[in-house]
Amino acid sequence: GDSYEKLESEINARSITLEDRIGQFIFGYGEDPIEKVIGKTLLDKKLTLSVAESCTGGYLSHLITSIPGSSAYFLGSMVPYDYQIKMRQLGVKPETLEKYGAVSEPTIIEMANIVRAKFNTDIGVATSGIAGPGGATPDKPVGTIWIAYSDKHQTVTRKLQLSKDRMINIRSASIAVLNLIRLSLP
């Protein structure tokens, strides 16, 4: 451009066009990670959050609590990795696990709803899946992960089909949950 102002105007115009096309994937501007953006949003809306995570093994809770002041909105989490713990400690119905398995939409819905009720939070989220490298079945390959968001008005689920790499799956699923929170907030 001929000048800084003209160049800035062109960048702004193109940014608006880009936002129109991929806005759902933009969570902020600058260098703030999504967990910080979500934390600020929860604070601003005076909402609380709880987590039940299986395949992510606490990584999602780690991301949330890595932000200073997260205790103002994050009340706690459970990591019910085992079937028995999912039933006894979290409260997933045995018949749900028997009929659908741990890596299923009905199970993840129960997990998100139950953790929200147990912790008495505005929002409950959950993860369950096959992070890998083992544990796959023909209908549930490595990288199959269910995530859920629950508040008093709605429960939203997503089925992810990620990679064969365990750490990539754990990280990607955790970020996907944070994005699901962002997209689902009232």
Sequence positions of predicted segments:
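Short beta-strand-to-loop capping motifs
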Residues: G1-D2
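Short alpha-helical segments enriched in small residues
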Residues: E5-P186
